[in-house]
């Protein structure tokens, strides 16, 4: 079971989160064709497809523009890197914390 957590913005879904989560869902489907997807996974996959399967769409979101304005350009660039690690964090729902390997 895989859970992708999107933080959103001010209690609402954020476009850039949905685009990035959609990329992750697409990659999971490449690894496991026929994988059963929940409603949220299908929704973010649709967002990713509507964005033309390009992370640049996330970088053009209003929130991303705001982050650039206040000096977080390097952080955005760092976060939009793809395939730079093989590490996947594990989460303990009972504590809300990441698990040690």
What is the predicted function of each stretch?
Residues 15-101:
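Long, charged alpha-helical interface segments
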Residues 11:
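Phosphate-binding/catalytic loops
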Residues 4-8:
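Short, structured patches in soluble enzyme cores that scaffold and shape functional sites
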Residues 1:
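Residues at the starts of beta-strands that form the adenosine-phosphate
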């Amino acid at each position: 079971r895989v859970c992708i957590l999107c933080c959103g913005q001010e209690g609402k879904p954020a476009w850039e989160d949905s685009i990035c989560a959609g990329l992750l869902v697409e990659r999971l489907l490449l690894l496991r064709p026929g994988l059963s997807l929940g409603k949220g996974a299908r929704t973010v996959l649709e967002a990713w497809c509507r964005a033309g399967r390009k992370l640049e769409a996330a970088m053009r979101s209003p929130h991303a523009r705001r982050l650039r304005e206040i000096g977080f350009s390097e952080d955005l660039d760092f976060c939009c890197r793809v395939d730079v690690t093989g590490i996947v964090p594990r989460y303990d729902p009972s504590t809300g914390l990441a698990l040690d390997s």
